[in-house]
């Protein structure tokens, strides 16, 4: 039985196994706190994320279960990886992952990025997305603060709490507004992996310019700003809008022509602008896919089709439509955690034996 120790962090009790020491607060979110810590077993610095009250409601239980399942399933160099998970005696859940020194949001607010860093960061984002999308997963909340970077410029996408299955009837308010794809704002119904490409395009533009491309004050203003640059959506895109109110709003906007992005990004090279043009397309069906974007001339210095892996198997979303009580989610969560530790122990045994 693991020994647990308690520490007070920012008024919150962290109840963690004695394996982790030197806790320091590094981030706060709506659903949890993240601390850095030292792993006594490996001597490595790690991030410990406490999920607040994971069993307080069925919705929170399901959200936590989904994030746990995704972290277990997604194994890729550009995706944050799980190194430990446990439930404390107080029934809080803790995810332990590798610790990266900073995130893209902090980098972008501290100084302009040089061209080779922009290229390398975008390459790694798209490499991670190619893998995630091949697993049948849409991140849905891609933004600079969810993209972690270390001192070697290795990049990892994190925070899969909002991630969803590709396709049927996806729901509206999800990602941070500046990076939200127009089809999420317009249809509030069906969308797919292309929403992540739009978000990556917004992040790419921000790396080039040093400031957000579409800093909307609200949804109406956000959409208006997008049309000022990209023009009015094509009629066949407008026809996909499900909400009558949204349809009326879009039809009431003045007709606008798409502006050449080269005029907006005067200091960017033509290849960068061309890739951005292919990422920021109103019609998701015509938006470039991660795999295609990786092969674009702008990313030629890093592109290696033999080292851009896809998932071995699709993620199992069968639980996602389940409407279950908290106790059932709890049993399922315990089962997943036991499975994680059993598999982990088997892998270590195999490595030690080889």
Swiss-Prot record:
Modified residues (Phosphothreonine): 171
UniProt keyword list: Activator, ATP-binding, Cytoplasm, Kinase, Nucleotide-binding, Nucleus, Phosphoprotein, Serine/threonine-protein kinase, Transcription, Transcription regulation, Transferase
Post-translational modification summary for this protein: Dually phosphorylated on Thr-171 and Tyr-173, which activates the enzyme.
GO cellular component: cytoplasm; nucleus
Phosphotyrosine modifications at: 173
Positions with a binding annotation for ATP: 26-34, 49
UniProt keyword annotation of Ligase present: no
Any Pfam family: Pkinase
Motif residue range(s): TXY: 171-173
Example of a GO biological process term: stress-activated MAPK cascade
Active-site residues, as the UniProt record annotates them: 141
Source organism superkingdom: Eukaryota
Subcellular location: Cytoplasm; Nucleus
Cofactor: Mg(2+)
Top-level EC class as recorded in UniProt: transferase
Domain Protein kinase: start-end pairs: 20-299
PANTHER family noted in UniProt: MITOGEN-ACTIVATED PROTEIN KINASE
Job description of the protein: Proline-directed serine/threonine-protein kinase involved in a signal transduction pathway that is activated by changes in the osmolarity of the extracellular environment. Controls osmotic regulation of transcription of target genes.
UniProt name for this protein: Mitogen-activated protein kinase HOG1
Classification of source organism: Eukaryota, Fungi, Dikarya, Ascomycota, Pezizomycotina
Gene: HOG1
């Amino acid at each position: 039985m693991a020994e647990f120790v308690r520490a007070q962090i920012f008024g919150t009790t962290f109840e963690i196994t004695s394996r982790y020491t030197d806790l320091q607060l590094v981030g706060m979110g709506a659903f949890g706190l993240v601390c850095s810590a030292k792993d006594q077993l490996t001597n490595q610095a790690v991030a410990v994320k406490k999920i607040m009250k994971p069993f307080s409601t069925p919705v929170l239980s399901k959200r936590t279960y989904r994030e746990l399942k995704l972290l277990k399933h997604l194994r890729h160099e550009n995706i944050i990886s799980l190194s430990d998970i446990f439930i404390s005696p107080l029934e809080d859940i803790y995810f332990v992952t590798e610790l990266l020194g900073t995130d893209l949001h902090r980098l972008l607010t501290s100084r302009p990025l040089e061209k080779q860093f922009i290229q390398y960061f975008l390459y790694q984002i798209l490499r991670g997305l190619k893998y995630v999308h091949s697993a049948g997963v849409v991140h849905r909340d891609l933004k600079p603060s969810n993209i972690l970077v270390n001192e070697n410029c290795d990049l990892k996408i994190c925070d899969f709490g909002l991630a969803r299955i590709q396709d049927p009837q996806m729901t509206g308010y999800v990602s941070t507004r500046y990076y939200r794809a127009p089809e999420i704002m317009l249809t509030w119904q069906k969308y797919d992996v292309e929403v992540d490409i739009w978000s990556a395009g917004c992040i790419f533009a921000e790396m080039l310019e040093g400031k957000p491309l579409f800093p909307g004050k609200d949804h109406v203003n956000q959409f208006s700003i997008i049309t000022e640059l990209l023009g009015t959506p094509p009629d066949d895109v407008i026809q996909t809008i499900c909400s009558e109110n949204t349809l009326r709003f879009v039809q009431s906007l003045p007709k606008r022509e798409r502006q050449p992005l080269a005029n907006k990004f005067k200091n960017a090279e033509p290849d960068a602008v061309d890739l951005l043009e292919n990422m920021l397309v109103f019609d998701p069906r015509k938006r470039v896919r991660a795999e295609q974007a990786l092969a674009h001339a702008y990313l030629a210095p890093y592109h290696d089709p033999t080292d851009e892996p896809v998932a071995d198997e699709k993620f199992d979303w069968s639980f996602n439509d389940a409407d279950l009580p908290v106790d059932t989610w709890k049993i399922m969560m315990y089962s997943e955690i036991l499975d994680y530790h059993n598999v982990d122990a088997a892998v270590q045994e195999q490595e030690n034996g080889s």
